[in-house]
A protein has these predicted regions:
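Non-ligating segments of multi-cofactor redox enzymes
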Residues: 1-208
Length: 208
């Protein structure tokens, strides 16, 4: 029975893969863009090689900031952990890395990372879209500046928020509190004005 189920599962997976490739080419199997991984998983090649899609890191995140990638993110990436800053933000507690059974999420210095040391851990960098940012287009919203726990966002002479990427560790607080998506949803808005994007190992050194 087990072998029958295994063969059936293999056939189903093969069929899905073939269909996706036929519909979207080889790109349907892989991510359509860089993935924002939990802390300790920024080396994408090493992470993908080690991740077993077990979901333990998702369950361990007390802030609910870790979710599972979907098929839309690529067949090979489906069910791998990604940061979902619409649900919460990262405080670098290290629980996700501690429960990872394979080391795909590498351990990091929790105390240093929690204090804002980007050398200890850097998930990504916050990027601001000025064209939809309330502070840059109409009102005096400064929530991202007020809530950033690492002083990685400052205000320019006109009161507009500006991200200091050298200080940003990608915690996601700014993205979590940004009200733009809610306010623009009635006109078809699909994104917040500030969002954390992944960086490759070493890329965070740029701008220091």
């Amino acid at each position: 029975m087990i072998s029958q189920i295994s063969r059936r599962s293999f056939c189903v997976a093969a069929g899905v893969s073939a269909t996706l490739v036929a519909l979207g080419g080889a790109g349907a199997l892989t991510a359509q863009g860089a993935m924002l991984r939990p802390p300790g998983g920024q080396d994408e090649r090493a992470f993908v090689a080690g991740c077993t899609h077990c979901g333990r890191c998702v369950s361990a995140c007390h802030a609910r900031a870790i979710g599972a990638a979907s098929l839309a993110d690529g067949l090979l990436e489906a069910r791998t952990p990604v940061m979902r800053y619409n649900l919460g933000f990262c405080d670098f507690c290290g629980d996700c890395a501690r429960v990872c059974p394979t080391g795909a999420l590498r351990p990091f210095d929790v105390e240093a990372a929690s204090a804002g040391d980007v050398d200890a851990c850097c998930i990504g960098k916050a990027r601001l879209s000025r064209e939809i940012c309330l502070a840059w287009t109409s009102s005096s919203c400064n929530l991202c500046y007020e809530e950033c726990p690492y002083e990685a966002i400052s205000l320019d002479g006109d009161g507009h928020p500006v991200v200091d990427e050298a200080r940003c560790n990608g915690c996601g607080v700014c993205e979590y509190v940004c009200p733009v998506l809610s306010l623009r949803s009635y006109i078809g808005g699909t994104a917040r004005a500030i969002a954390v994007v992944p960086v490759s190992p070493g890329e965070e050194e740029v701008g220091r």
